[in-house]
C-alpha cells in the first residue's frame, strides 16, 4: 500500500510539500516523533482516506470503499496503518459524505477504533452503536497547537450529496491543508469568496 505522508516539526512552507505530492506522487518527510502535525494520505484505490495526527490526538477523514466481494479498505488498509502507528483509539472519524468511496470502510473503523466523535456530512450507516453528529461550518477546535475547522456545509440546503461533504481545514504555523470531500465547483467558489 502506497502512503503519502507529511510530518511537520517546525513551521515550514506546507505548499512546497503538497506540491511535491502532486508532482511526484510520493512524499515522506519524516516519521520520527515528536511532530506537531502528521498528515498521511492512504492509497485506498478509488476513494479517500486521510489520517491526521498530532502528538496526542488522531483523526481519520474518510475511510475509503468497501465492496460486495467483502474487501473493505477500512479493515484492510486504514486499520493496519493505524495499528502500525500505535493508534488504538480515534479521537474523531469524519465521513465527508455517504458515497461508498468515502464511507464504505467507516463501519470497520468504528468497530475497531471506537472514535470519541463521529462527524458526517449526511446520514451514513456506521452500525447501531454509532451516534453521529453533522459537521457544520463554524465548528472549530484545537489539538496540540493545531487548529481544525469545518468550512462546509453551512445552513444552505445542497442538492448534490457531493456538495454536502464535510470540508475540513487544518491550520498549523500559518499554513493550511484543506480536505474537501467531493465538493463541486460551485461550493469551491463559495469557499473562496
Which stretches of residues belong to each language-model region?
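Short, exposed "boundary/linker" segments that immediately precede the start
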Residues: 1-6
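Non-globular, low-confidence helical/coil segments that flank catalytic cores
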Residues: 7-193
Amino acid at each position: 500500500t502506497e502512503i503519502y505522508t507529511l510530518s511537520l516539526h517546525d513551521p515550514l512552507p506546507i505548499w512546497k510539500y503538497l506540491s511535491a505530492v502532486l508532482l511526484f506522487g510520493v512524499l515522506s518527510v519524516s516519521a520520527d516523533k515528536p511532530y506537531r502535525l502528521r498528515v498521511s494520505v492512504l492509497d485506498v484505490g478509488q476513494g479517500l482516506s486521510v489520517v491526521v495526527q498530532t502528538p496526542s490526538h488522531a483523526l481519520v477523514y474518510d475511510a475509503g470503499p468497501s465492496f460486495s466481494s467483502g474487501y473493505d479498505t477500512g479493515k484492510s488498509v486504514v486499520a493496519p496503518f493505524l495499528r502500525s502507528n500505535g493508534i488504538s483509539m480515534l479521537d474523531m472519524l469524519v465521513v465527508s459524505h455517504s458515497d461508498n468511496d468515502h464511507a464504505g470502510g467507516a463501519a470497520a473503523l468504528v468497530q475497531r477504533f471506537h472514535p470519541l466523535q463521529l462527524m458526517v456530512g449526511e446520514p451514513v450507516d456506521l452500525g447501531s452503536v454509532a451516534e453521529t453528529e453533522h459537521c457544520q461550518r463554524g465548528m472549530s477546535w484545537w489539538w496540540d497547537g493545531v487548529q481544525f475547522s469545518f468550512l462546509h456545509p453551512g445552513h444552505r440546503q445542497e442538492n448534490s450529496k457531493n456538495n454536502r461533504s464535510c470540508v475540513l481545514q487544518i491550520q498549523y504555523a500559518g499554513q493550511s491543508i484543506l480536505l474537501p470531500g467531493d465538493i463541486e465547483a460551485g461550493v469551491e467558489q463559495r469557499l473562496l469568496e
